[in-house]
Amino acid sequence: MEPPLPTPMLLLLLLLLSSSAALPAPPRTPRHSDGMFTSELSRLQDSARLQRLLQGLVGKRSEQDTENIPENSLARSKPLEDQLCLLWSNTQTLQDWLLPRLSLDGSLSLWLPPGPRSAVDRSEWTETTRPPR
């Protein structure tokens, strides 16, 4: 006795199932959230890369500077692990750039370069530069 032949419906179902599994999925259209994620990810990677670079540079610089400092002064000036320590050879230059400056109109300005202030007072300067009437 031979097994019964499959019905045409069963053959059609098998054909559909086998062909749909062989086809690749259609490509997904890019979404706005994909761009936001990749943008944020690349920004974080750049930030981590910059942080590693700074730690490498500062670490090397700190090691070079600590070789020249006696051991007893290291105990009190050792920075914490989480702090970023930049060692400047000229502290006066650093203070000049960090302290706020008075601009010509009397307001504080962090962007004026360091150095001695001009000998001309603000009122003298405005009188000499004022156009004639």
From Swiss-Prot:
Protein's cellular compartments: Secreted
Phosphoserine carried by residues: S62
GO molecular function: digestive hormone activity; hormone activity
In-chain residues carrying the UniProt-annotated modification Valine amide: V58
Keyword Cell membrane in record: no
Keywords associated with the record: Amidation, Cleavage on pair of basic residues, Hormone, Phosphoprotein, Secreted, Signal
Propeptide intervals in chain numbering: 23-30, 62-133
Gene inactivation effect: Mice are viable and fertile. Mice however display impairment in synaptic plasticity in the CA1 area of the hippocampus. Mice exhibit decreased neural progenitor cells in the subgranular zone of the dentate gyrus during the early postnatal period, leading to decreased volume of dentate gyrus, reduced long-term potentiation and impaired spatial learning ability in adults.
GO biological process: adenylate cyclase-activating G protein-coupled receptor signaling pathway; dentate gyrus development; diet induced thermogenesis; hippocampus development; intracellular water homeostasis; negative regulation of neuron apoptotic process; neuron apoptotic process; neuronal stem cell population maintenance
Disulfide cysteine pairs (residue numbers): none
Signal peptide: 1-22
Listed PROSITE patterns: GLUCAGON
Tissue: Highly expressed in the intestine. Also expressed in the hippocampus, cerebellum and the brain stem in adult mouse brain. In the hippocampus, expressed in the dentate gyrus, the hilus and the molecular layer.
GO cellular component assignments: extracellular space
Function: Hormone involved in different processes, such as regulation of the pH of the duodenal content, food intake and water homeostasis. Exerts its biological effects by binding to secretin receptor (SCTR), a G-protein coupled receptor expressed in the basolateral domain of several cells. Acts as a key gastrointestinal hormone by regulating the pH of the duodenal content.
Family according to the record: Belongs to the glucagon family.
Protein name: Secretin
Species the sequence originates in: Mus musculus (Mouse)
